[in-house]
Every structure is written in structure tokens, then in C-alpha cells.
């Protein structure tokens, strides 16, 4: 084997020293196995070393070579069997090594260091290093160290905890260069066993505590060593896999080193799985204390380079081992001494990882133990991402918390950010405390308040070492100690304490001594330890408004949960929400004020919440009216900022949080928020109020507490105080109503300024002082606070634009629908007389001025009806639980007919006269009693006639009067006794789900004499008009039935308004006290709705005199201030007088109403039928249109295809005609040429014959002349003979010359010969003529066939082409499919393709096919022209495929 040997004679102990920085703790078993591990060489894997160390066979000379030299030196051969000692039996094999080496070590960058810390570091270096170990300064770079990527995994998390549950850091070996680390790791969530699968480990980053403060250190950049070790192999066995560029950071008392583990470290961790399991036994000793180990303690590193000596390997190894042990003991003793010196000044401020509850115990001054409930689960999550080696910084812990908070609460990305986004500035703790105290002094001086009421973050931080077990910080690399000056946090209890003091000062009522004592005992434990002289300026108080308001809305809107749910779970979720939000707030405060705000999430894990809450402020208590045990909610701490709720408030509204007690939010915070809202809109600035009302409708519930505060102040001591705990349903509904009155507060003050006001000056002054107190608490010294608060309102306007547009669109649709229904309804009334309506309108003309007075109020609260739909679901839930389902359903039906009778009810808005209302109330009350006796009448009939617009007017007025009653409590309480009696009389109607509603009782509230006189005049006028109406009703009943019905409708309008008010108030006034208070005001209506309406109409129709008496009795009741006994007695007397009347006319009214309902039902059915018909027509039209479109599309497509086809046909025909013409021209040319040749031959033959005959004639004439001279007597005979011979041989005999010459000897012989010749010539000419005729017949036949072929060519060519497509030059395919083109009548027997596999079978089939389709064979068989044409084409295709087949075969 070959190893690299160092050229320098470096000692073995120096090797240990240089490599000491690679480890921090080791186990007790097989500690020094790493001494004998060697660097992994590509030539020799680890398994080879294991085989060598164990030895092979019985040979005692197989001893492993244990020297591990450096890798950058020359090579030398080593004899493995040079030693006799088997070290494997002494030190154990690699597979059994049990030391623990961290895969990653923490390195913290040192950015800025104070001079004190630097001096202390130098002192520690001097005292902590031995003479033979070189010092490593901050800037000094070690060549043995290389960078390893940080992955937020602390080394000590792989070490299990001890019996006490705490974890300590095993003493760093003495041979490690540089000062001894004094880092203490407190992490209870440790891995007991490293599994083979990948298990990410969360990061635990710690700061080094110092006596003077905390410092952050930066790791110096190191140069890489000459050899790069694949760091990924280190974690091959324990499942932790990283990249080779990862860096491991090591803490050394503020000095940072970048360490790269050598290959021996890789060998160690690549052992068996059991080695990883033995890591669980490494931990011993408590946290923050280093214990001295024995000689065999884990003080030797698991890997280092050893110098090799060829001759004495064992001797040098033993010497180096002893020296390493001694140095380790020395180092450990030094470290122990240094830790003892630091015990007194140590301070730990860590925050645990878990966001859940944790228990913290304080064991002395040096032991810190943290037990986190969910830390094991959190260990499976990597909270920081890998960073590049060049960056060499920790992953931001704040980002990790922000991610976890966003994941837990479903908050969008941009809302929660960690404090690492801030740009930190490093300050001393002393300066921070001084600056904090200065801010507190200025705040107390500004408010002139005693110290300790408001507490800041720094005070809580100072009391932590006393009240709580110290927690450790979890800093970012970039995060430093940050002052908290601009952003204090307040508890609800602290705010409630101040509020309670103010309330007691004005009301004289004290909170129960029992709870006060309990509060004092609990607070003393905390307040005594907090600095009393700290309080923030007014800007910080203003910053608390948005978060407090958000928290209130969050508590109120969340459904009430059962009492059985543990209070600890409530605190955990609330604290998580607050802490997650305070990170965002601290970031905003830093950007605006320039201060670095420390995130309040230091308590987000709940580590100190429980302890703090137990000792915290418990002043947020609310007394119930009997003084029983109060319900106390634990105070929640919040760090607030002025701009936090701009984006976060919308998310918190939807966040499900456990419901806390309403008294907490009502008592301590809500009133302050409400006064700050009032401060935004001054009384004179009505436009600003209106704008705020329209733009911020969702913030209405925060006004609830201001009502409660003032009610506590105004309530007499003898009466029951309204400051009591209400159910969630009552509070939600009452809050929504009260906010209507508060929104129009300033507008109502302007209206009331025209009339005299009689108010209690003492209570009014108290109210003013209390208002100014809260205004001062939440208003800055300059206009910055107001501007920021106003900007908060302005910022939400944009978010409501979309909602308002959608709401307006929805309302328009509803208005159109209702108006359509109204038109149908009005159509049934078109024949009625209009005189009564005009009279009714004239009666109302005198009161139009009242409407003008309230026009501004209607404008201010016009948006309330739009917001009714937003809160419809909340109102429904509240009404169902309180038994108001019936009233809510009535209100919903009223909303459906909101604008149906807009014109008829326009003048009802001014019907606010209290005296007239009392008269109507008495009448309806009497008729209600009669109706209760007679039985129930169908209540659904009049329900459809309700008019919403009239109800809207009175809903607005109810809100105004409720607010006025708050301002004048004495007048309101004066009527409370009357309310009780009225409630008793009308208990049945209240139980049915309806409640009596108050209206504008201006005489009681204004208290002005002039107003009372004017109302008295109006009362008289109303009485006269009422008598006239009753008289006219009686006359009309006897005369005209239609006129009577019209008067009924006029009277219904008034009753509808009362019903609308009753239905609205049933939802608005779930509280019993508010119902009673509403019932006592002047404008009283019948609460039963339809029954009161029917009774009232029947009484007015039937008995004019009886109702006159009722009006007189009512008038007397109105003149009385208390009106209790007289009202009751008059109702009883009048009930006896009118009971018979109502009983007789109940059926008539019921029939009348039934007819109306039937008419409306028929109209509704007709409308539905029309809608259905229209829908069917529309669908039929749509279907017809779709069909027409489809047909049109098809027609267009067909036309396009036809045009294309027409364009293609001429082209094809032209091509076919050209081809036919070519073929015809060739045949015709051939026939013409043949014909010409035949004619020429005939002409030549005829010319020859004519010449011969002429020649014979001339010769015969000459011979005859000579014979006549010779023989004179025989002239005539010879002439006749010559004539016969010439005639008989004219065409046959051509050479008559010799014959004539021979005939001269024999007279009869030449004549026979000439005859024979002529016959021969005749036969020849006949044969020629026959041949010519035959030829002509053949030519004609050929021409016919050609014509037929041309006619069939187009169709046959298409068939042949279709058959041969894809099979060109494929002989097998053509032959196997030949039957498809030839046809069944051809007689061709198909040949399957399976028979054409071999070449021989293909050749045989080809010959058979060619014989069958050959043109000559077809001619012999007498085939038709079509068959001939097809066979010719097939023959040509087969011939071409055969040529291709032959080429392929060759």
C-alpha cells in the first residue's frame, strides 16, 4: 500500500492540535477510533481498510498500519505487517465507533464588536491557549480549514438530553486552537436516533452572552484547502445529505472558523447503523455548565492526520495518543475555570422555537432548561434554506417565523415579515434603557399620569429574569440588539385600569372589592418589578388604536365558542395572532420613525405568556348588576403601530380566533377607540362625518363601549346599571343599532340646536370631561396623529368601492323587481276614487317641514340600508338564538317590497309627532287586545303590503332618538316606569317575537316649552283629522264599498309604518332594557303588526263614537307625565267597548284581505306564467335560430363543395377529352393512311387496264387491215372475230400480241385464252374489293370501341386508381386484391396473401394473372370494352410491379 507522507517532521501532537477544531464533542466508547482512520483514497475504499484492520485468518502478523499522513506530500510504501501488535483489538473497528461528530457547526458572523468584548476576547485567548498551540486571531486564516455551507443545524441537536431534560455542550478539546468556546445550547428537541432516511433538523442559533451585553460576530472568510473532500459522503449513512460546497460554522467565543471535515470524518460516519444509534448516550450534565471528564472522556477528535514512520508505527502512535490525552485534560480544565468565572455574569435571553406554550423553570443562576411541547415535531422541519458559500450567513430566523405564522393563520405573503428585513443598528443595552426611560418620563409628563399604568416592552424585558425563567434569543445574523422606543405594547388590563378609574371618578360606583383585591395581589408581583417611570408619548398611544380596534372586531365577529374549551388554547391562538401581527407593525414603525423596533414575537412561542398573564394586570373586569363574581379575561399583550391595520385588518376580520369575554374588549379598549373616531369628525364638519359613514361601514361595532361607558356614568345609583355582561347576540345587535345613532351624532346636534334643550348640566359636564380625557389619550400633540388616523379611513375607501358598486347594482335590480310588482298591484286599484288620497296628502302637507329638518340625517344614514345586507347573516344568527326569527322574516319581506309604494308613503316620513303617535298607539293597543280575544287572524295578508321606504324613515329616526336619549338620560329614565306597565299589558305581543319601538319623542327629549306647545297644536289638529277620517269612513261604509276600501288602504299606510318599525326594532333592540326604553317614547306602535292593523281598521270602520272616546282617553293619557295608571284603565274600558265591534267585523276584514291576497296571487301566477311563456318563446327562438344557423352553415358548406366540384369536373373532362382526342387522332390517322393507300392502288390498277385495252385494240385493228388486203374474200369474218376477241379479253388478256400472232396460225385458239385471262383478272379484283370492305368494317368497329373506351375512361380510371392506391409496385398486394377490381363476373379466383409469401409463389401468381388480364386473351374471350379497358390498366400495373419485384429480388 502507498500513503502520502509529509515532507516535514510534524509531530503527532501537532496533528492533533491542528485537527482539533474539527470536533466539539465525543462519546465515551471507542473515542479514539478516529485516530486510526485514514483518508479515503480512490484506490482503497473504506471496506478494504476494515478487512485489513480485522486481519485475515490465523496469521498474527496481519497488523493494520495506523498512520494517517497528510494528503499533499509524496508517497512512500508501507509494510502493513511491520508491527506485531493488533490495534484492532485495542481500539475497536470502524464499525463500532461511538463518537458523535456534528455534521454542521454554528458560525456567527462578527459584524461590529464593542471595545469591551474585544478586550475580554483577548484576555480569554491569553488564558485559554497552551504554549504549543498557535493562536488563531479573527483575521488569521488556517490552511486546514475550508468552507462548509451552513444549513441551520446545530451540532448539539444530534445529542440526546440527559435525565433532567436539558442538553449541555461537551467540553471542546484542549487541543483546539483559539479560545475555548463558551457557547451553551439549550435545546430539548434532540434526535435520539439518526435514521437512514433523510431527517432535516431545525436550526438553533445562539448568541454568546457577555457581562456587558450581547454581541454578534461575523465569520471570517477562509481559504480552501488544497484537497476538496466530497462533503456529501459524510452524511451518507445517517441520512443527512448535503452538497459538497456546504460550510459548517463553528463558534469559538466570538471567533469564527470555517471548518471542512477531513476524509477520516467521512469514514467515521460511514460506519454501521448501530454506531449512529449509540449517539443517544452521549449527553450528560445540565445546560450552561461544562463538566470535567475523566481520562477516557470524549476529548480526542475523531479525525486527524498522523505522521507515519516506517520503522516504529506503533511506538509513535502510542506516544501521540498519550500526549493528546494530556493536552485534552489541560484544555478541559481551562475551559471549566473560565466557565466558573462567567457563571455570575451569564444572562440568557433565548426564545424557543415552538410557537406553542412552553414551561420555563429557573434553576439557580446558571442552569437554564427549556421544555418545548412540540419541539420533536419541529425538528423534522428545516426552517432555513441553504445559502451559497460566498454568503456565509445564517438563514433568517425571522423569515422562518413569518412563514410559520402565515402558514398557521392563512395570512398572505406581504403581511407578515420578520425583523430581519430591518436594517439593524447596534446599540448598547445601557443606552437602550436610558432612552426608554427618557421616553417614559416624557410620556408621563405629557399625560400627567402616575407611572406604571402603561408599561413598555423594555420594562417587561427587565422583569423577565425575576418573574420568568430566562429565555434565550434566536437572533438573525444581521439582527442586532434593537431599542424599543416608539412602539410600546399595552395590555387590555392596563387600559382597562385607567378606564375604570375614570369611570369611578364620574359615577361614584366602585368595582367589587373582592375582584379589586384579587387584582391587587396579582399585579403587585409584576408591578413591583417593573420600572414605574416609563410611558410613551401620544404618538405611541395613537398607534394602539388600529390594532385594538382590529382585535375588538375580531373578538366580536367570531362565533361564541363553548365554555368547555380550555382558556390556555384561547391564549395560545390569540397570542399567536398578536405576535404574528406585531412583526408587521414593528417593520412599519421602523420605516416611519427611523427606530429599529424589536419584534414582540419574542413571546410568540408562549414561553413567557402564561407566567406573565398570571402576574399581569387583571383590571379588565366588568361588574354585573348584582355584583356577583366577575368574568375576567387574561390580558393580551400587543405591540401596535399606527399603520398596521391598513392591510392587516382585513385579514384579521376573517381569521378564526377563539372568542374572549366581551367585557374585556368593551371595558378596556372599545370606548377609547370610539372617542378617537369621534375626534376625527368634529361637530361642525358634517361632510367629513358623512364621508366617513359611507366609506367605513364595517367599523360600526367599536362604538358599543362608548355607550356602555356613558350608561355607567348616567345611570342612577339606585337603578340597575346597564354596565352588565350581555350575550353575544344582544351585544351584536344592540351595537349595530347604537352605531347608527352615533354616526349621526353631530348632525342631530345641529337639528336639535333649533329648539331649546333641557339637559342635566352635571351629567353633561361629566360626559364632556370623559370625552376630552379619551380624546387626549388617543390624540397626538401635533396633527400627525390625526392625519395618520384620517389616512387610515381614507385608505379603506378604495377597498369599499367595489362593494358599494355591487351593492348599488343589487339594489337597482331589487328596486326594478319591486316596482314591477307595485305596478301590477296598482293596476287593481286604478278605479278607486282619488279624493280620499288627496285629502290624506293635504293632511300631511302641514308636516313637510319636519321632513326637511331630518333630510340631513337621512343623507347621513342613507347608507345604513345598504349595509343591512352585509350584516344580514349576523342578524339572522342573533335573531334565531334570541327568538326573533319571526320579526326578521317580516323584515325580510318588507325589504322585498321596499320601493313598491314610494309615492303613497312619501309624506309619512314627517309623521314623527309624539302626541299623534300616542293616539295611534292607544288605538292599536286596544284593538290588539280585542284581536287577542277574537283569535288569530291571518298575518300573512297584510305582510305583503308593508312599505319599506316608510320604515326606512323611521328606522333612521329611531337611531337619532336613541342617541338623544343617551344625551338626556334623566328624561329617558323618567319614562322607565311607564315602560314597565306597558310592557306588562303587551307581554303577549312581545312574546310572539315583536317588540314595541320608540319613535321621535321630541317633547320628552328636547324639554323645550315651545316645542311642547307646537306638539300640542299638532295633537289637536291630528285629533280633528282623525275624527273626520273616522266619520268619513262610517259614511262611506254605508254608501260606497269601494270608497271604504280606499280609506282602509290609507289607514293601512300608517299601520304599515308602525309594523315596519316594530319589525326593525325587534332586530335592533334585542336587549330587554332597550326594548322597554323604546316603548316609552311618544311614537308608540302596535307591536303585533298585522293583528293590530286589522283591529284598528275594523274599529275605525265600525264605531266612530267608540273610537272618539278612545282618542279622548288617549289625549288624557298623553297630558299626564307618568301616564301609567290612566293608560292602563283607559285600555281596559275601551277594550270592553270595542271587543264586540272587532268580533263582528273580523270576518269582513279577513274576507277583504283574502280577496286582496287572491288578486295578488293570481297576478303573481299570471306573471309567472308570462315569464314562463316568454322563456319558452325565447328558448324556441334560440333553438330556431341555432337550427337556422346550422342549416345555413351546412348550405354554405355544400355550396362551397359544389363550386369546388364544378371547378374540378371541367378540368377532369378537359384532360379526358384531350387524351381521347389524342387516341382518336392516332387511330384515325392510321385508318386514313390505309384508305389512301388502298385508293391509290385501285387507281393504279384501273389505269393499267385502260392502257392494256387500248393497246390490244390498236393491234387488232392493224392485223385485220393486213389480212383484208391479203385475203379479199374473208374481210367480214375477220372483223367480227376481232371484235369478239377484243371484247372478251379486254380486262384479262394483257399480252395479246403473241396470241394474235399465234391466232394467225390457228383461228380458234386465241379467243379461249383471252377469256381465261379476263376471268382471272375479275377474281383478283373481287378479292381486292372484299378485302377493302373488310378493312373498312374493322376500322369502323375499332372507332366505336375507342369511343366507348373514352366514355368509360373517367369512371374506370377512378376505380383502378382507388384500387391501386397504396399498392403501387407491390406485386403481392396487387395480386391478392385482384378480385376487387376485376369483379365477380370476371371468373378470377382470389389468391390469399398468405400464399404469396415465397418468391416462387409470387412468380406463379403473376404469370397466372397476366394471362388472365392480357388484352389478346380478352379479345379471344370476347370481353366487353369495360373489361378490356380495366384489364389493360391492371396489366400495366402488374407489369410495373413485376419489374420492381425483380429488381428487389436481384
Swiss-Prot record:
SUPFAM superfamilies in UniProt: Chaperone J-domain
Record's keyword annotation contains Nuclease: no
Biased composition (Low complexity): 1270-1299
UniProt entry keywords in alphabetical sequence: Coiled coil
UniProt domain J: residue ranges: 1377-1450
Keyword Disulfide bond: no
Coiled-coil ranges (or none): 316-344, 1142-1184, 1219-1257, 1327-1355
Basic and acidic residues bias spans: 357-366, 512-524, 564-575, 908-923, 1037-1046, 1117-1131, 1147-1168, 1192-1226, 1310-1328
InterPro entries named in the record: DnaJ_domain, J_dom_sf
Region (Disordered): 117-142, 241-318, 357-383, 459-480, 512-541, 556-575, 908-946, 961-1046, 1077-1168, 1192-1241, 1254-1328
Protein name (Swiss-Prot/TrEMBL): Auxilin-like protein 1
Upper lineage: Eukaryota, Viridiplantae, Streptophyta, Embryophyta, Tracheophyta
Amino acid at each position: 500500500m502507498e500513503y502520502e507522507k509529509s515532507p516535514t517532521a510534524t509531530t503527532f501532537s501537532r496533528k492533533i492540535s491542528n485537527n482539533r477544531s474539527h470536533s466539539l464533542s465525543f462519546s465515551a466508547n471507542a473515542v479514539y477510533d478516529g485516530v486510526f482512520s485514514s483518508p479515503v483514497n480512490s484506490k482503497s475504499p473504506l471496506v478494504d481498510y476494515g478487512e485489513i484492520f480485522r486481519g485475515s485468518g490465523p496469521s498474527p502478523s496481519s497488523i493494520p498500519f495506523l498512520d494517517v499522513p497528510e494528503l499533499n506530500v509524496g508517497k512512500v510504501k508501507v509494510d502493513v505487517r511491520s508491527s506485531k501488535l493488533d490495534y484492532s483489538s485495542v481500539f475497536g473497528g470502524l464499525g463500532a465507533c461511538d463518537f458523535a461528530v456534528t455534521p454542521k457547526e454554528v458560525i456567527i458572523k462578527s459584524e461590529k464588536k464593542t471595545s469591551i468584548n474585544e478586550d475580554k476576547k483577548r484576555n480569554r485567548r491569553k488564558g485559554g491557549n497552551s504554549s504549543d498551540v498557535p493562536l488563531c486571531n479573527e483575521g488569521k486564516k488556517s490552511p486546514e480549514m475550508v468552507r462548509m455551507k451552513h444549513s441551520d443545524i446545530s451540532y448539539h441537536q444530534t445529542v440526546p438530553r440527559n435525565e433532567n431534560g436539558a442538553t449541555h455542550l461537551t467540553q471542546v478539546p484542549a487541543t483546539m486552537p483559539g479560545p475555548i468556546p463558551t457557547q451553551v445550547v439549550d435545546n430539548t428537541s434532540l434526535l435520539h436516533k439518526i435514521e437512514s432516511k433523510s431527517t432535516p433538523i431545525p436550526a438553533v442559533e445562539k448568541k454568546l452572552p457577555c457581562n456587558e451585553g450581547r454581541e454578534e460576530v461575523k465569520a471570517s472568510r477562509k481559504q480552501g484547502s488544497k484537497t476538496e473532500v466530497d462533503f456529501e459522503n459524510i452524511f451518507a449513512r445517517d441520512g443527512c445529505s448535503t452538497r459538497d460546497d456546504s460550510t459548517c460554522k463553528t463558534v469559538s467565543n466570538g471567533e469564527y472558523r470555517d471548518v471542512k471535515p477531513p476524509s477520516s470524518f467521512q469514514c467515521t460516519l460511514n460506519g454501521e447503523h448501530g454506531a449512529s444509534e449509540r449517539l443517544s448516550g452521549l449527553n450528560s450534565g445540565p445546560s450552561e455548565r461544562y463538566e470535567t471528564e475523566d481520562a477516557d472522556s470524549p476529548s480526542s477528535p475523531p479525525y486527524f492526520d498522523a505522521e507515519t514512520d516506517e520503522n516504529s508505527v506503533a511506538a509513535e502512535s502510542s506516544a501521540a495518543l498519550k500526549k493528546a490525552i494530556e493536552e485534552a485534560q489541560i484544555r478541559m480544565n481551562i475551559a471549566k475555570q473560565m466557565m466558573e468565572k462567567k457563571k455570575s455574569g451569564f444572562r440568557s435571553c433565548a426564545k424557543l422555537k415552538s410557537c406553542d406554550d412552553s414551561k420555563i423553570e429557573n434553576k439557580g443562576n446558571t442552569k437554564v432548561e427549556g421544555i418545548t411541547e412540540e419541539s420533536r415535531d419541529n425538528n423534522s422541519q428545516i426552517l432555513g434554506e441553504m445559502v451559497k458559500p460566498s454568503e456565509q450567513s445564517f438563514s433568517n430566523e425571522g423569515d422562518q417565523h413569518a412563514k410559520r405564522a402565515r402558514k398557521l393563520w392563512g395570512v398572505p405573503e406581504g403581511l407578515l415579515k420578520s425583523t430581519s428585513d430591518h436594517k439593524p443598528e447596534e446599540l448598547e443595552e445601557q443606552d437602550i434603557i436610558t432612552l426608554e426611560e427618557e421616553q417614559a418620563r416624557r410620556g408621563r409628563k405629557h399625560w400627567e399620569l402616575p407611572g406604571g399604568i402603561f408599561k413598555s416592552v423594555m420594562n417587561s424585558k427587565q422583569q423577565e429574569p425575576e418573574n420568568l425563567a430566562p429565555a434565550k434569543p434566536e437572533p438573525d445574523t444581521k439582527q442586532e440588539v434593537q431599542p424599543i422606543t416608539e412602539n410600546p405594547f399595552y395590555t387590555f388590563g392596563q387600559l382597562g385600569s385607567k378606564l375604570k378609574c375614570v369611570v369611578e371618578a364620574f359615577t361614584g360606583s366602585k368595582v367589587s372589592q373582592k375582584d379589586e383585591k384579587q387584582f391587587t395581589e396579582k399585579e403587585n408581583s409584576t408591578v413591583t418589578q417593573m420600572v414605574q417611570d416609563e410611558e410613551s408619548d401620544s404618538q405611541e398611544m395613537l398607534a394602539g388604536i388600529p390594532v385594538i380596534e382590529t382585535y375588538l372586531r375580531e373578538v366580536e365577529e367570531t362565533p361564541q365558542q363553548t365554555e368547555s374549551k380550555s382558556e390556555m388554547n384561547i391564549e395560545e391562538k390569540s397570542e399567536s395572532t398578536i405576535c404574528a401581527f406585531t412583526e408587521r407593525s414593528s417593520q412599519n414603525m421602523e420605516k416611519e420613525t427611523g427606530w429599529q423596533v424589536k419584534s414582540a414575537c419574542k413571546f410568540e412561542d408562549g414561553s413567557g405568556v402564561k407566567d406573565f398573564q398570571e402576574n399581569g394586570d387583571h383590571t379588565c373586569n366588568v361588574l354585573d348588576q348584582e355584583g356577583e363574581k366577575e368574568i375576567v379575561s387574561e390580558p393580551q399583550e400587543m405591540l401596535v403601530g399606527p399603520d398596521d391595520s391598513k392591510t392587516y385588518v382585513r385579514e384579521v376580520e376573517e381569521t378564526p380566533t377563539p372568542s374572549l369575554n366581551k367585557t374585556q374588549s368593551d371595558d378596556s379598549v372599545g370606548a377609547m377607540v370610539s372617542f378617537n373616531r369621534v375626534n376625527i369628525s368634529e361637530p361642525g364638519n358634517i361632510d367629513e362625518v358623512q364621508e366617513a359613514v359611507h366609506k367605513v361601514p364595517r367599523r360600526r361595532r367599536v362604538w358599543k363601549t362608548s355607550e356602555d361607558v356613558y350608561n355607567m356614568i348616567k345611570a342612577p345609583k339606585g337603578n340597575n346599571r346597564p354596565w352588565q355582561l350581555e350575550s353575544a347576540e344582544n351585544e351584536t345587535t344592540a351595537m349595530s343599532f347604537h352605531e347608527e345613532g352615533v354616526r349621526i351624532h353631530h348632525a342631530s346636534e345641529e337639528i336639535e340646536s333649533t329648539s331649546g334643550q333641557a339637559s342635566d348640566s352635571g351629567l353633561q359636564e361629566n360626559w364632556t370631561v370623559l370625552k376630552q380625557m379619551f380624546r387626549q389619550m388617543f390624540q397626538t400633540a401635533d396633527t400627525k396623529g390625526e392625519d395618520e388616523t384620517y389616512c387610515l379611513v381614507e385608505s379603506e375607501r378604495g377597498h369599499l368601492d367595489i362593494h358599494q358598486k355591487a351593492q348599488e347594482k343589487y339594489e337597482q335590480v331589487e328596486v326594478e323587481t319591486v316596482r314591477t310588482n307595485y305596478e301590477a298591484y296598482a293596476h287593481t286599484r286604478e278605479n278607486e276614487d282619488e279624493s280620499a288620497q288627496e285629502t290624506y296628502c293635504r293632511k300631511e302637507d302641514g308636516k313637510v317641514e319636519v321632513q326637511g329638518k331630518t333630510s340631513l340625517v337621512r343623507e347621513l344614514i342613507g347608507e345604513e340600508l345598504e349595509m343591512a345586507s352585509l350584516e344580514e347573516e349576523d342578524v339572522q344568527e342573533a335573531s334565531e338564538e334570541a327568538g326573533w326569527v319571526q320579526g326578521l322574516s317580516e323584515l325580510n319581506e318588507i325589504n322585498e317590497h321596499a320601493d313598491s309604494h314610494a309615492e303613497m308613503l312619501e309624506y309619512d316620513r314627517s309623521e314623527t309627532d309624539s302626541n299623534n303617535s300616542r293616539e295611534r298607539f292607544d288605538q292599536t293597543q286596544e284593538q290588539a287586545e280585542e284581536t287577542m280575544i277574537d283569535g288569530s287572524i291571518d298575518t300573512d295578508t297584510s305582510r305583503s303590503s308593508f312599505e319599506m321606504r316608510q320604515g326606512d324613515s323611521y328606522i333612521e329616526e329611531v337611531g337619532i332618538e336613541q342617541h338623544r336619549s343617551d344625551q338626556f338620560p334623566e328624561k329617558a329614565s323618567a319614562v322607565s316606569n311607564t315602560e314597565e306597565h306597558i310592557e306588562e299589558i303587551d307581554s303577549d305581543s312581545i312574546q310572539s317575537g315583536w317588540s314595541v319601538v320608540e319613535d321621535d319623542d321630541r317633547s320628552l327629549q328636547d324639554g323645550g316649552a315651545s316645542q311642547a306647545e307646537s306638539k300640542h297644536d299638532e295633537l289637536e289638529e291630528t285629533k280633528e283629522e282623525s275624527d273626520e277620517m273616522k266619520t268619513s269612513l262610517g259614511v262611506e261604509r254605508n254608501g260606497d264599498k269601494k270608497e271604504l276600501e280606499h280609506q282602509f288602504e290609507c289607514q293601512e299606510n300608517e299601520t304599515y309604518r308602525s309594523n315596519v318599525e316594530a319589525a326593525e326594532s325587534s332586530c335592533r333592540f334585542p336587549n330587554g332594557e332597550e326594548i322597554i326604553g323604546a316603548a316609552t317614547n311618544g311614537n308608540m306602535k302596535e307591536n303585533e303588526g298585522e293583528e293590530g292593523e286589522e283591529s284598528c281598521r275594523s274599529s275605525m270602520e265600525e264605531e266612530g263614537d267608540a273610537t272618539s272616546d278612545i282618542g279622548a282617553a288617549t289625549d288624557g293619557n298623553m297630558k299626564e307625565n307618568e301616564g301609567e295608571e290612566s293608560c292602563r284603565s283607559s285600555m281596559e274600558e275601551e277594550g270592553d267597548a270595542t271587543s264586540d265591534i272587532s268580533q263582528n267585523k273580523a270576518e269582513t276584514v279577513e274576507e277583504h284581505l283574502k280577496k286582496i291576497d287572491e288578486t295578488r296571487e293570481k297576478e303573481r301566477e299570471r306573471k309567472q306564467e308570462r315569464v314562463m311563456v316568454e322563456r319558452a318563446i325565447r328558448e324556441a327562438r334560440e333553438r330556431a335560430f341555432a337550427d337556422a344557423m346550422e342549416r345555413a352553415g351546412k348550405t354554405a358548406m355544400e355550396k362551397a363543395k359544389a363550386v369546388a366540384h364544378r371547378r374540378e369536373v371541367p378540368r377532369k373532362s378537359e384532360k379526358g377529352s384531350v387524351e381521347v382526342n389524342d387516341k382518336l387522332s392516332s387511330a384515325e390517322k392510321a385508318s386514313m393512311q390505309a384508305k389512301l393507300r388502298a385508293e391509290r392502288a385501285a387507281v393504279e390498277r384501273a389505269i393499267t387496264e385502260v392502257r392494256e385495252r387500248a393497246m390490244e385494240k390498236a393491234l387488232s385493228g392493224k392485223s385485220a387491215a393486213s389480212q383484208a388486203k391479203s385475203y379479199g374474200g374473208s374481210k367480214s369474218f375477220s372483223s367480227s372475230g376481232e371484235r369478239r376477241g377484243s371484247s372478251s379479253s379486254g380486262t384479262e388478256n394483257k399480252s395479246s400480241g403473241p396470241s394474235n400472232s399465234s391466232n394467225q396460225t390457228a383461228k380458234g385458239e386465241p379467243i379461249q385464252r383471252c377469256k381465261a385471262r379476263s376471268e382471272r383478272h375479275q377474281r383478283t379484283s373481287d378479292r381486292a374489293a372484299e378485302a377493302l370492305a373488310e378493312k373498312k368494317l374493322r376500322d369502323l368497329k375499332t372507332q366505336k370501341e375507342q369511343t366507348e373506351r373514352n366514355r368509360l375512361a373517367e369512371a374506370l380510371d377512378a376505380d383502378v386508381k382507388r384500387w391501386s392506391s397504396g399498392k403501387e409496385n407491390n406485386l403481392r398486394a396487387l395480386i391478392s386484391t385482384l378480385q376487387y377490381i376485376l369483379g365477380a363476373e370476371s371468373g378470377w379466383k382470389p389468391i390469399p396473401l398468405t400464399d404469396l409469401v415465397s418468391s416462387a409463389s409470387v412468380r406463379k401468381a403473376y404469370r397466372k394473372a397476366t394471362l388472365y388480364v392480357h388484352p389478346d386473351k380478352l379479345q379471344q374471350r370476347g370481353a366487353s370494352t369495360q373489361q378490356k379497358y380495366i384489364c389493360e390498366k391492371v396489366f400495366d400495373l402488374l407489369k410495373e410491379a413485376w419489374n420492381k419485384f425483380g429488381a428487389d429480388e436481384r
